[in-house]
């Protein structure tokens, strides 16, 4: 979560992520890896996973150029796993590859954000409905426990911890839906949300709203009321979209 990076809107209606040279981002990547981000080995899978997290955590900034030689040096590997990792991340939409200029971290436009939240509302609503109908053992207790931890983080004004717990709450809900395809699609949505340059939880009053919205979903899940759970989850996402746009546009 990078609440200190406030975007501006471009003339084309997008988010103006400042153009980045590769050097600064790669220096941050070296520090990130040195601080203990897990690269369990030097395989393509290991490198891909670590690079993905670096993008999602904002260490590799939107629009930053990704030079194979610099990345290979940072990861202490040859260019081969770097090249394959960039290809995989391009397939996931996290990296953009060009014919003559190499690869760069993908940036999201304002139009992308709007499209993202349309899909997110549908998918989160479906996850809530399925979770309520199936209500696996321990799910309601897990949702309530995470929400209680969020309340404590909000009281401390710990936005970073609050954001992590918010992700955990939504992961628990979609896991409770017990649909592997839905979980996969929502994982991709989460990746896109994590790439945005600010969190809605910095907006005044939003943490308390989120806690109440989560509780409404959890109570519907507890009652096994799929229709009401979906309604609350959709309302939660619509409000999230409103706040997201306010944060991005400086409102």
Model-derived regions: residue spans:
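Mobile beta-alpha loop/short-helix "lid" or hinge segments that flank ligand
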Residues: 90-96, 189-191, 205-208
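Short coil/turn segments
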Residues: 135-136, 206
């Amino acid at each position: 979560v990078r609440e200190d990076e406030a975007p501006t809107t471009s003339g084309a209606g997008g988010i103006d992520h400042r153009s980045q040279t590769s050097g600064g981002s790669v220096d941050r990547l070296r520090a990130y890896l040195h601080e203990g981000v897990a690269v369990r080995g030097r395989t393509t899978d290991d490198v891909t996973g670590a690079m993905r997290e670096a993008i999602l955590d904002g260490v590799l900034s939107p629009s930053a150029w990704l030079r194979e030689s610099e990345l290979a040096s940072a990861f202490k590997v040859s260019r081969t796993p770097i090249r394959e990792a960039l290809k995989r991340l391009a397939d996931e939409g996290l990296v953009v590859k060009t014919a003559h200029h190499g690869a760069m971290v993908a940036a999201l436009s304002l139009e992308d954000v709007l499209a993202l939240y349309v899909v997110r509302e549908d998918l989160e609503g479906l996850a809530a409905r399925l979770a309520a109908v199936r209500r696996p053992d321990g799910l309601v207790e897990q949702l309530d426990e995470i929400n209680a931890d969020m309340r404590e983080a909000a009281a401390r004004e710990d936005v970073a911890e609050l954001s992590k717990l918010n992700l955990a709450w939504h992961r628990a809900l979609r896991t409770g839906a017990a649909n592997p395809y839905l979980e996969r699609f929502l994982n991709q949505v989460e990746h896109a949300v994590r790439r945005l340059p600010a969190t809605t939880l910095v907006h005044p009053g939003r943490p308390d709203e989120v806690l109440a919205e989560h509780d409404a979903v959890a109570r519907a899940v507890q009652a096994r009321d799929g229709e009401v759970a979906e309604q609350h989850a959709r309302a939660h996402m619509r409000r999230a979209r409103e706040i997201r746009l306010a944060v991005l546009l400086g409102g």
